[in-house]
Amino acid sequence: MSRAAELVSVLEATDSLAIVCHDNPDPDCLASALALEAIARDHDVEEVTIAYGGEISHQQNRAFVNLLEISLRTLSRTAIEEYDSVSFVDHTRPGANTEVPADVTPDIVVDHHPGESVDAAFEDVRDEYGATATIFIEYLQELEVDLTTRLASALLFALHRERLDFVREPTRREYEAALAVYPDADLEILEQLYGSAFSPGTLDAIGRAIASRERRGSSLVASVGKTGETDALPQAADYLLNLEGVDTVLVYGVVGDAIRLSGRSIDPRVHMGETLAEGFDELGAVGGHHDMAGGRIELGLFADDDDDDGALLEFVGGRLTRRFFDALNLDD
């Protein structure tokens, strides 16, 4: 039985499905959720809810939700225990990068990030793929689910934002998947999405990252300072990769009560996920791919409530920078 057929066998025993996106969902996660919703409805699942934790702060991601009219519900307003089945898309582990408690076992998991098995009834994790959307496009093709303009547009944009717009190792599968959905996509919507990339807050954060950058060889560390926009960190990291001679970037910043990390690398010798794990695993939750990774460290490890923001960032920055360069074996 194919993986798509196995997925259908689980859905056919389900009347209600909660599709859980990871915190602060990006287009790959959201488009994958839409694809699973389409497959579920095509196989007579009566109630489908797409839920997420965190916030959608990235201007482009907000435009993605609004232009494609994606119906979402926050996890705080979703009683997932009342659904027959719970699905994770673009993430695998409860309690990690999701507000879902660690003691909840999902019934369906589809992801392209490496991770430990969670004993779901259906689990399809392909870390050799460049995007979760690619996996769902293969499902849609095999199951002959009607591809609406809305879904095709969402999937095509997700493929571009996750892989095809970057040097970060898109696989042949991403190009083939893009060709499959391209004829049904609305290119005007994609143009509008590309025109909504940066909010003023994100531009300010990128400016702080540029000003604070510290470089050793082809590697660079920068701070966005204190920001309310989690998505500003990966955007700043992507931007700094454009600096001549730089191939590896770590951006950090304080978001709420945590220090957020976002790493990017186009150096084939650097595994960013392993590098962050080596440098920061004992401090918080970190991990990711060969070319992109992230993490979250509780601010309480470094600070008291009364600490001055500027002094705190200087204190934290020095330690994070040293740990990152040490993990890359880069001397002063």
Q: Predicted segment positions?
A:
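Secretory targeting signatures
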Residues: 1-4, 10, 29-32, 162
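Gly/His-enriched, cation/cofactor- and phosphate-binding structural elements
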Residues: 5, 12-17, 22, 30, ...
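Anionic-ligand anchoring segments at beta-strand to alpha-helix junctions in alpha/beta enzyme folds, i.e.
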Residues: 16-75
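Divalent metal-coordination and catalytic microenvironments
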Residues: 26, 36, 65, 111, ...
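Hydrophobic/aromatic beta-strand patches that form the interior of the parallel beta-sheet core
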Residues: 51, 87, 106-110, 123-125, ...
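Active-site cofactor/cluster-binding pocket
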Residues: 70-119
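Short alpha-helices
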Residues: 110-178
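Glycine-rich, Lys/Arg-enriched anion-binding loops that position phosphate/diphosphate groups
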Residues: 163-234, 242, 246-247
